[in-house]
UniProtKB/Swiss-Prot annotation:
Its main location: cytoplasm. Keywords: Cytoplasm, Pentose shunt, Schiff base, Transferase. GO terms for cellular component: cytosol. PANTHER family: TRANSALDOLASE (PTHR10683:SF18). This is Transaldolase.
Amino acid sequence: MTNKLTSLRKLTTVVADTGDIAAMKLYQPQDATTNPSLILNAAQIPEYRKLIDEAIEWARSQSDSREQQIVDACDKLAVNIGLEILKLIPGRISTEVDARLSYDTEACIVKARRLIKLYNEAGISNDRILIKLASTWQGIRAAEQLEKEGINCNLTLLFSFAQARACAEAGVYLISPFVGRIMDWYKANTDKKEFAPAEDPGVISVTEIYNYYKEHGYNTVVMGASFRNIGEILELAGCDRLTISPALLKELSEAQGEVEHKLSFNGEVKSRPAPITEAEFYWQHNADPMAVDKLSDGIRKFAVDQEKLEKMIADLL
């Protein structure tokens, strides 16, 4: 009998949500995603020490300014970890722009170009990289410009339908709607403490976005993210991609049985509405308290981990 991970791969592209090279070797995903929190965790792994040392040495050669060296070393470390992961996967690595830039379109564009340049200088072409940006209005506008330059983007921290719609209309390559963090909010802010997978508000959100994209002929890839259990994952089988932590990949690989195909679209494509305006985006996003809370919370948490990473680098400089 097949295991559920093998069965899921027949329906959905499986992506590893980790910076851990050992996990890549074990689960052999198509793609991998990283973020500041995962880079910080990966930096604690002894085998990665040489990647940190190399990033610091390189940063020292780029600038005499200590502050700039810290920024450069963090960028180079994220790319160094990405390069190691790319040796083990056939597809793409997602590398994230500093979350503190999430409300500055031009700064996001500049940072994205810098990360791409570092990958290119290491011999990696753009078609193996996704630049991760927070799904703020400014992040989406940055992605719109980057896509025109041939830099594909992964729009993350996506919690509202307004964010999803704006991303599709901007022509971004991929979105990462969060599942588990949506459920976390409903558990914390409502009387309901348990959700069956089909009733999980995060699952319902991704299903709605997936159906809308397919019904309107958008090419933007839907990659469900931030899972709390395999029930959520199995309920989204058939989604374009799912990015899954090593712990849940392990659980899927140990569970026996075929996975039922849940998401698919065979209907007629409808005409698209006029693009959402900035005012409409903020009004509709603001109407969803969960999305407002989780977007700002996610940006703050990634920013905190970026600052921890910078402190770790500063202590080694």
